[in-house]
Amino acid sequence: MDVLRTPDERFEGLADWSFAPHYTEVTDADGTALRIHHVDEGPKDQRPILLMHGEPSWAYLYRKVIAELVAKGHRVVAPDLVGFGRSDKPAKRTDYTYERHVAWMSAWLEQNDLKDIVLFCQDWGGLIGLRLVAAFPERFSAVVVSNTGLPIGVGKSEGFEAWLNFSQNTPELPVGFILNGGTARDLSDAERSAYDAPFPDESYKEGARIFPALVPITPEHASVEENKAAWAVLETFDKPFVTAFSDADPITRGGEAMFLARVPGTKNVAHTTLKGGHFVQEDSPVEIAALLDGLVAGLPQA
């Protein structure tokens, strides 16, 4: 496959973003090498807190959470999904599938050999991150899900349907504008520009374009069976599993119910509702960091 790489200068001087880039090369099943970017801040001898973003953002979404957690002494790892941020971007929309995303991030996880992970995942960060939990449950010590799900082809919310229609039909995908529309506060011009930074033009956005159409919302969608198999693993996951959905997200409202009903790790832990929109990391970063700090403090020492 043909691959685009956003020039480094696009990421210079971004607001509140001083983290050094780290890169891992993974190989697709077709032999194509793909470079995946991640942030790795804080003491390397601490258990990693893994922050996974979704559509159409990148690790920048977690910049305030990262700073808060590092100040509390934690190690924080935040990757960019393939097609986003500083990670490579396959050039064709058809290069992107749900299963390829899972395979790419599985290879990334294994190459970096992360263990004893505390995962926070939102949006597609959950659709992919929870598949990683199901594939490598021994690598994860705790999970926090926020404004996400693991769909098995049983329908969609009105909010998601509106987003799907917009994303597939708009002539240009205005990423910074989309991020601003999904937060309770107004992002600054500099913040919106940072979300636009990974995409010099529309040709870099094929991964962002196709993501909404890859969500398994009908029985005929690809990955329904794979997600059902992942649910079977999650139904045995008895380590701490916290729901932290926001109070103003029309896309995933009520999505915590399935986790609470099916994942044994949701018992005997405190759940929370965060204030904010779909991109709750922009609205409640201090609260997210405090939640993760408290969760880690309650885990047995590795």
Curated annotation (Swiss-Prot):
Enzyme active site: 123 (nucleophile), 249 (proton donor), 278 (proton acceptor)
InterPro entries listed in its UniProt record: AB_hydrolase_1 (IPR000073), AB_hydrolase_fold (IPR029058), Epox_hydrolase-like (IPR000639), Haloalkane_dehalogenase (IPR051340), Haloalkane_dehalogenase_1 (IPR023489)
Assembly and interaction partners: Monomer.
Function of the molecule: Catalyzes hydrolytic cleavage of carbon-halogen bonds in halogenated aliphatic compounds, leading to the formation of the corresponding primary alcohols, halide ions and protons.
Keywords: Hydrolase
NCBIfam families: PRK00870.1
Family the entry assigns: Belongs to the haloalkane dehalogenase family. Type 1 subfamily.
Catalytic activity, reaction form: 1-haloalkane + H2O = a halide anion + a primary alcohol + H(+)
EC number: 3.8.1.5
One Pfam family per UniProt: Abhydrolase_1
Domain AB hydrolase-1: 48-152
Organism for this UniProt entry: Caulobacter vibrioides (strain ATCC 19089 / CIP 103742 / CB 15)
Keyword check for Secreted: no
Name the record gives this protein: Haloalkane dehalogenase
GO molecular function terms attached to this record: epoxide hydrolase activity; haloalkane dehalogenase activity
